[in-house]
């Protein structure tokens, strides 16, 4: 029997994935395609399947295995991701999925904001727009505002990566 599996992050499926189709399968038992594509339903179901099956969790290989990993060059936590981030992350995702399909132990580790300078600048500009400055509000209040900004946009960025279908090991964020 010829089997074609939709690649969902791991080829270690053994044909048991609900998205595996067999040439000799009974087509009467197959779900009919909808007339229109409903991305929110489809993408949520697939994203949940990936999470439930641990499709993107890094699995340590033996000491003789050659591992492949990428740490996302962290986007600054200055705002939501833009098209340039999507392109960059897509290229990384292609490399990770290729190596995963080739049987390499893989890890694509997400992260955000490597230095904080850009985030500090954005928060300072916001304070200026509000008619104050970091010096006027004091160090503790400024650190608190910067932390709140970081927490808000870090969540947005991680949620965007998940929505894009990035095959990161999100348990490592």
Where are these regions (language model features)?
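Short hydrophobic targeting helices and cationic amphipathic motifs
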Residues: 8-11, 17
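N-terminal, positively charged nucleic-acid-binding surface of large information/translation enzymes
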Residues: 21, 26-173
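Compositionally biased, low-structure terminal segments
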Residues: 6-8, 22
């Amino acid at each position: 029997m010829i089997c074609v599996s939709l690649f969902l992050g791991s080829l270690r499926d053994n044909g048991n994935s609900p998205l595996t189709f067999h040439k000799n399968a009974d087509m009467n038992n197959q779900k009919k395609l909808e007339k229109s594509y409903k991305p929110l339903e489809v993408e949520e179901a697939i994203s949940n399947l990936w999470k439930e099956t641990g499709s993107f969790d890094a699995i340590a290989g033996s000491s003789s295995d050659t591992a492949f990993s990428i740490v996302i060059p962290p986007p600054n936590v200055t705002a939501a991701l833009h098209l340039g981030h999507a392109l960059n992350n897509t290229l990384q995702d292609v490399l990770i999925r290729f190596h995963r399909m080739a049987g390499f132990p893989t890890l694509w580790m997400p992260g955000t904001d490597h230095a904080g300078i850009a985030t500090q600048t954005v928060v300072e500009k916001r304070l200026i727009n509000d008619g104050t400055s970091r010096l006027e509000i004091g160090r503790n209040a400024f650190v608190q505002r910067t932390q709140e900004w970081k927490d808000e946009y870090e969540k947005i960025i991680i949620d965007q990566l998940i929505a894009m279908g990035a095959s990161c090991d999100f348990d490592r964020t």
